[in-house]
Curated annotation (Swiss-Prot):
This is Histidinol dehydrogenase. Catalyzes the sequential NAD-dependent oxidations of L-histidinol to L-histidinaldehyde and then to L-histidine. Binds 1 zinc ion per subunit. One of its GO terms (cellular component) is cytosol. It catalyses: L-histidinol + 2 NAD(+) + H2O = L-histidine + 2 NADH + 3 H(+). InterPro entries: Ald_DH/histidinol_DH (IPR016161), Histidinol_DH_CS (IPR001692), Histidinol_DH_monofunct (IPR022695), Hstdl_DH (IPR012131). Its cofactor is Zn(2+). Pathway: Amino-acid biosynthesis; L-histidine biosynthesis; L-histidine from 5-phospho-alpha-D-ribose 1-diphosphate: step 9/9. Zn(2+) binds at Q265, H268, D367, H426. Belongs to the histidinol dehydrogenase family.
Length: 448
C-alpha cells in the first residue's frame, strides 16, 4: 500500500493563514561563515596568483591533474566536435530551442533614440551592449545545456562582443550537450574551471581568463557567495534561491497533470517549492492522491518527496479572486494559470517571473523551448525583479547636446538650483554660458 503524501494543507479561511503562509515561504540560504570565509580566501588567491591559483584549485576541487591553464582551455573546434557526438535528435532539439529563444529575445532589443527641442537642444539615450559577459555553467554529467542557451543567446542578441563560458569538469566528466549548446549559442571562449575560483577569474581576470563586465548563470552555494562578493566589480544577474512553481487551478484540469507539474520543480532539489492553490477542496484531494500514486514512478523520487513534504502545499481558497490574491502575495518564479479563461485573470497578476497560460501550457515548456528566458526571479523577488533578457546585457547612456540658445536658457535654471545647494562651481559653470546680460546682471556674483 502506498503511503499518502504528507504535503502541507492550508486554508485561506483559517485566521492564522497569513502566518502559516509566511512560514511556508520562508527560506534561508545555507551559506554560513565558514563558506563565506573560504570563498573570500579563494577570491583573494585568484586575484593575487591568477592562473596558478586556478590550476591549483582545479586540481584540489575537481580531481584533475593539469599542468597549466593550457589544459583548461577548450578551443572552438572542441565545441564543434561536440555537435557530432550528440544524437541527431538531440541536435535538432537544441537547434529548435535555440531558434525559438533567439527569436523571442530579438524582440527585446532596445534602440537608441533622441529628440530635438525648438531651440536646437538635443536629448536622447544611447544603448550600448556590454563588451564581455561571463557565463557560469554547472559541470559534470548532470549539467544543463538549456541554461547555456538561456544565458548566452540573450547576450549575443544584445550585441555582446565576447561571451566567455566557464564549466567545471569534475574527474574529467564533461557533458557533450553543454558543449554543443555553447557552439549553437555562439559562445566565444570556454574554460573548464568552476566554483568560486571561476567567478573570481571572470570578475578580476587572470593571465588567461579575460575580465568580463557581467557574470551570469546558476551555481552552488560557493558560486552564489562568490557572485555576491564580486558584485560591484562586475554586474551579476541575480542570486537565485530554490526553484518554485505555483499552480492556480479551477479544479477542471487532470489532477495527474497538476501533480506532475508540481514534480517538475520539486525534482530540482530538496529546497524547491511546489504549491497548488484552488477553490475546489475535492480537487485538492484528487491531486494529493495523484502525488501519492505518481511519486514512486519518479527517477528522483527521494528528492521530490523531500521537497513536496518539506516546502510544498495544497492551499484551499474561497474563489478564484482569492487565488489570485494568494499568487500575488507569493510572487512565484513560475506561475501556472490552469484555468478555463486565463486571459481574464492575467491583468490581475502583478508579481510572477513567468506566467503559463492555460491547461496545456506546462512549466517545462518554458524551461526548455517556448522562447522566453528560464532565468527568473525567486524567493518573492518577482515583486521587483524581471527575467534575464537582452536588456541585462545592454546599458544606457544619456545624451545631452545644448545649442547656444538652449545653454543660455537652461543655464538660468541650473544657476538658481545650484546656488540653492551652495554649489557655486556648478552655478558659475552654467552662468558662463548665459548670453542674457540683464539676467546675469541681476543674478550672478559679478554680473558677467
Amino acid at each position: 500500500m502506498t503511503t499518502p503524501t504528507a504535503i502541507r494543507r492550508l486554508d485561506a479561511a483559517d485566521p492564522d493563514f497569513a502566518r502559516h503562509l509566511d512560514h511556508l515561504l520562508s527560506w534561508e540560504s545555507v551559506s554560513d561563515d565558514s563558506v563565506n570565509q573560504r570563498v573570500l580566501d579563494i577570491i583573494k588567491a585568484v586575484r593575487e596568483r591568477g592562473d596558478e591559483a586556478l590550476v591549483e584549485f582545479t586540481q584540489k576541487f575537481d580531481g584533475l591533474q593539469v599542468a597549466s591553464m593550457a589544459d583548461l582551455i577548450l578551443p572552438r573546434e572542441r565545441l564543434e566536435l561536440a555537435l557530432t557526438r550528440i544524437t541527431p535528435v538531440q541536435r535538432e532539439a537544441l537547434e529548435k530551442a535555440a531558434e525559438r529563444v533567439r527569436s523571442y529575445h530579438e524582440k527585446q532589443k532596445q534602440d537608441s533614440w533622441s529628440y530635438t527641442e525648438a531651440d536646437g537642444t538635443v536629448l536622447g539615450q544611447k544603448v550600448t551592449p556590454l563588451d564581455r559577459a561571463g557565463l557560469y555553467v554547472p559541470g559534470g554529467k548532470a549539467s544543463y545545456p538549456s541554461s547555456v542557451l538561456m544565458n548566452a543567446i540573450p547576450a549575443k542578441v544584445a550585441g555582446v562582443t565576447e561571451v566567455v563560458m566557464v564549466v567545471p569538469t569534475p574527474r574529467g566528466e564533461i557533458n557533450e550537450l553543454v558543449l554543443a549548446a555553447a557552439c549553437i549559442a555562439g559562445v566565444d571562449r570556454v574554460f573548464t574551471i568552476g566554483g568560486a575560483q571561476a567567478v573570481a577569474a571572470l570578475a578580476y581576470g587572470t593571465e588567461s581568463v579575460p575580465k568580463v563586465d557581467k557574470v551570469v548563470g546558476p551555481g552552488n552555494i560557493y558560486v552564489a557567495t562568490a557572485k555576491r562578493h564580486v558584485f560591484g566589480q562586475v554586474g551579476i544577474d541575480m542570486i537565485a534561491g530554490p526553484s518554485e512553481i505555483l499552480v492556480v487551478c479551477d479544479g477542471q484540469t487532470d489532477p495527474d497533470w497538476i501533480a506532475m507539474d508540481l514534480f517538475s520543480q520539486a525534482e530540482h532539489d530538496e529546497d524547491a517549492q511546489a504549491i497548488l492553490v484552488s477553490p475546489d477542496a475535492d480537487f485538492l484531494d484528487k491531486v494529493a492522491a495523484s502525488i501519492t500514486r505518481l511519486l514512486p514512478t519518479m527517477e528522483r523520487a527521494a528528492i521530490v518527496e523531500t521537497s513536496i513534504n518539506g516546502r510544498g502545499a495544497l492551499i484551499k481558497v474561497a474563489d478564484m479572486a482569492q487565488a489570485i490574491e494568494v499568487a500575488n502575495r507569493i510572487a512565484p518564479e513560475h506561475l501556472e494559470l490552469s484555468v478555463a479563461d486565463p486571459e481574464a485573470w492575467l491583468p490581475q497578476i502583478r508579481h510572477a517571473g513567468a506566467i503559463f497560460m492555460g491547461r496545456h501550457t506546462s512549466e517545462a515548456l518554458g524551461d526548455y523551448c517556448a522562447g522566453p528566458n528560464h532565468v527568473l526571479p525567486t524567493s518573492g523577488t518577482a515583486r521587483f525583479s524581471s527575467p534575464l533578457g537582452v536588456y541585462d546585457f545592454q546599458k544606457r547612456s544619456s545624451i545631452i547636446y545644448c545649442s547656444p540658445q538652449g545653454a543660455s536658457e537652461l543655464g538660468k535654471t541650473a544657476s538658481v538650483l545650484a546656488r540653492g545647494e551652495s554649489l557655486s562651481g556648478h552655478a558659475r559653470s552654467a552662468e558662463y554660458r548665459i548670453t542674457d546680460p540683464d539676467w546675469k546682471a541681476g543674478n550672478t556674483e559679478d554680473g558677467k
